Amino acid sequence: MRNKVSEMSGRDAEVVRVVVSPYRICPLGAHIDHQGGTVSAMTINKGILLGFVPSGDTEVVLRSGQFDGEVRFSSGLSSSAAVGIAYLLALESANGMNVSPLDNIEYDRLIENGYLGLRNGILDQSAILLSRYGCLMRMDCKSKEYEIIQPREPQNSDKTKIQKSYKVLLAFSGLRCALTNNPGYNCRVAECQEAAKFLLCASGKAEMDPRLCNGEYFHLILFSSFVILQLIMILIFFQTVEEEVYEAHKNELEPTLAKRAEHYFTENRRVAKGIAFLTWSFEIILEIHVYLVLCFINLWIYFIGSGLEAWKSGNSQDFGKLISASGLSSIYNYECGSEPLIQLNEILQRAPGVFGARFSGAGFRGCCLALVDADRAEEAASYVRSEYFELQPELASQLNADSAVLICKPGDCARVI
């Protein structure tokens, strides 16, 4: 990259800077970022490379190095956010500006919402800017609070099959259509807002911004004092008012709006189950046998997610099941997808070694993603190529055989190197 930019610009390779802006996947939390929901995401080792040389003046000269990358345009991996962030980081670096990731998330949201006209949330930008290698990023899109969560390392005594190393499989459909040209995406966002407006009116909060996250939070603070240990637990029961209101009034909602709200609330619960980001406090309480607290823990588990702390415990199988459940909700409640994408998703579900699969991105075109046993990734990729060609020969023939299904590893955050 440095040599190519050096040739184009006539400058020494030593002064060339390179932005690495990775693509992202969203295992859980699809289509709820624009409603202020809680999302999860990680980056992969594929993305945008942007080489540049600071010019010292106000002129910007752009040239294309190549368009022969492995990942096709409109693939459902957030390429628009990756490009926007690459430009932001390059321009900031060239001008000696130090901009925080949270500010850049907002700047790129303005690019997507204002310039491109796409009514999406902040999931894509947050994943690209905040992710860390091998970790899952969790973000509350209402408060913008986030956490980087690392799965538990298998212990020597772990003999279970659930703690397997994984890779990410990306299977491309061959469908290409810009989201700004497809009314389906923005229409779904509007329907979510209509559902939120109805539910807020039903709960006497009509003045609030019509997003499904809006309502009240209930904070419960428990304090236990011991000779050595002082334990402060803060349990936040998520969106209790909204879900109670939804359950009470969902039969009054127009059926389409009820489906959108159902996807939002169930997807929030799947994120919580998949991540279980307060597992540590539960383990401490078990050890000290605070039985009164355990009564409240039962309520906490109801909202945060029960038993199998999938991601944090390294349970790829249960985490994969949640991914697949999220995909089904995207099809039946959010009603995105198309026949080729749904077929591709079903093929991935049957593929050897796959823990779970779903659409990637908006789910109107592009690709499907799967979490797959690292030892069976090649076998799964071969199976998907063959099966998809049988069902969709015309679309499959448009794909490069070598990149129709990609085997990816986790990536890192966007950065200048």
Predicted feature locations:
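A short glycine/serine-rich beta->alpha loop
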Residues: 15, 34-38, 71-77, 112-117, ...
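Conserved phosphate/anionic-ligand binding catalytic regions in large, soluble enzymes, centered on
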Residues: 24-26, 33, 77-82, 119-128, ...
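Inter-helical turn/loop segments and adjacent helix faces that build the functional surface
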Residues: 91-101, 176-183
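DPxDG-like acidic metal-binding loop motif
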Residues: 37, 43-46, 77-97, 369-372
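Structural signature of FAD isoalloxazine-binding scaffolds in flavoprotein oxidoreductases
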Residues: 37-57, 131-132
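C-terminal nucleotide
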Residues: 1-28, 49-69, 135-358, 370-417
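Short, conserved phosphate-binding/catalytic loop or strand-edge motifs used
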Residues: 70, 85-86, 105-109, 365
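Alpha/beta catalytic cores of group-transfer enzymes, especially the acyltransferase/condensing modules
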Residues: 96-146, 357-360, 407, 411
